[in-house]
């Protein structure tokens, strides 16, 4: 049976961790599906990981659709989530709905992910009202890397931390059914996870999120040129073993440890957030 957003809400209620992995092809999707990974994210990170681009901004809708089709063919139980690429939803309501629907109709994805907060809440509402599950993404949002000044931890001071909380509330109110928090301080992610009714998925955001996500190539140590602080290599000899180790460590709370997290907020500052 295909996993669903309802089942992920139930996991949050039961305090059971959700596992997500970014992958881009049929073979890796089969491994993840057989390893009982909850969600396979066809991330726009494929622009850098697979296509050798410098950032995620150049990948197109047509390219994302091709890779999503491949993953959908390999995933029988895992929920397939597709990243909407840069400017495929920001430009207009019409583009947002039409492009989201293409992922469902043409690539057989089960939902879509978008980056941003209050500024795209109206797009989230339109897509979700059309019957498509929407996952939001806050913190370090790679599509806004030029505005953020690079790939840096977000929410390190009172103003920026409060902005992320306000955005999180806004996307939930707009109809998002899950939220990815990338590279925010552990205590901020913990506070957001406690405030929201929808599940949070962390990457570089600590162990208190309702689930975790890593890129398939990163958790297996396949990219020797990249090793972010939040990445842990599990096993590059046997992908199935590596994925299952990742799954088990997420579910048991072993991963991520403090070693793979960022913490810039003290308790005094945290108490001022609402």
Swiss-Prot record:
Broad EC category: transferase
Annotated compartments: Cytoplasm
Pathway membership: Cofactor biosynthesis; (R)-pantothenate biosynthesis; (R)-pantoate from 3-methyl-2-oxobutanoate: step 1/2
Chief location of this protein within or outside the cell: cytoplasm
Record GO biological process: pantothenate biosynthetic process
Co-factor binding details: Binds 1 Mg(2+) ion per subunit.
Molecular-function annotations in GO: 3-methyl-2-oxobutanoate hydroxymethyltransferase activity; magnesium ion binding
Top-rank lineage group of the source organism: Bacteria
EC code: 2.1.2.11
Cofactor list: Mg(2+)
Residue sites binding Mg(2+) per the record: 44, 83, 115
Active-site annotation: 182 (proton acceptor)
Binding positions (3-methyl-2-oxobutanoate): 44-45, 83, 113
UniProt KW Magnesium keyword: yes
InterPro entries: Pantoate_hydroxy_MeTrfase, Pyrv/PenolPyrv_kinase-like_dom, Pyrv_kinase-like_dom_sf
Catalytic activity: 3-methyl-2-oxobutanoate + (6R)-5,10-methylene-5,6,7,8-tetrahydrofolate + H2O = 2-dehydropantoate + (6S)-5,6,7,8-tetrahydrofolate
Keywords, ordered alphabetically: Cytoplasm, Magnesium, Metal-binding, Pantothenate biosynthesis, Transferase
GO CC terms, sorted: cytoplasm
Assembly: Homodecamer; pentamer of dimers.
Entry's family note: Belongs to the PanB family.
Purpose: Catalyzes the reversible reaction in which hydroxymethyl group from 5,10-methylenetetrahydrofolate is transferred onto alpha-ketoisovalerate to form ketopantoate.
Classification via NCBIfam families: panB, PRK00311.1
Protein name per UniProt: 3-methyl-2-oxobutanoate hydroxymethyltransferase
Organism of origin: Campylobacter jejuni subsp. jejuni serotype O:2 (strain ATCC 700819 / NCTC 11168)
Gene name tied to this protein: panB
């Amino acid at each position: 049976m295909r996993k669903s957003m309802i089942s992920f809400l139930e996991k949050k209620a039961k305090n059971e961790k959700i596992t997500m992995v970014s992958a881009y092809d049929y073979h890796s999707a089969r491994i993840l599906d057989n390893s009982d990974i909850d969600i396979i994210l066809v991330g726009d990170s494929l622009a850098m990981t697979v296509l050798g681009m410098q950032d995620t901004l150049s990948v197109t809708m047509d390219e994302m659709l091709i890779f999503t089709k491949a993953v959908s063919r390999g995933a029988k139980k895992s929920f397939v989530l597709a990243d909407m690429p840069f400017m495929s939803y920001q430009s207009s309501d019409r583009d947002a709905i039409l492009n989201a629907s293409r992922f469902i109709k043409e690539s057989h994805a089960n939902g879509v992910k978008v980056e941003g907060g209050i500024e795209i809440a109206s797009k989230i509402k339109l897509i979700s009202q059309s019957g498509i599950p929407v996952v939001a993404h806050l913190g370090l949002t790679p599509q806004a890397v030029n505005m953020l000044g690079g790939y840096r931890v977000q929410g390190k001071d009172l103003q920026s931390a409060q902005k992320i909380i306000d955005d999180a509330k806004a996307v939930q109110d707009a109809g998002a059914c899950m939220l990815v928090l990338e590279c925010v301080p552990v205590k901020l992610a913990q506070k957001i996870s406690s405030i929201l009714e929808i599940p949070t998925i962390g990457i570089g955001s600590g162990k208190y999120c309702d689930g975790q996500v890593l890129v398939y190539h990163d958790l297996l140590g396949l990219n020797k040129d990249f090793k972010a602080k939040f990445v842990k290599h599990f096993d590059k000899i046997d992908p199935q073993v590596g994925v299952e180790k990742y799954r088990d460590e997420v579910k048991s709370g072993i991963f991520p440890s403090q070693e793979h997290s960022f913490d810039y907020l003290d308790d005094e500052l945290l108490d001022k957030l609402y």
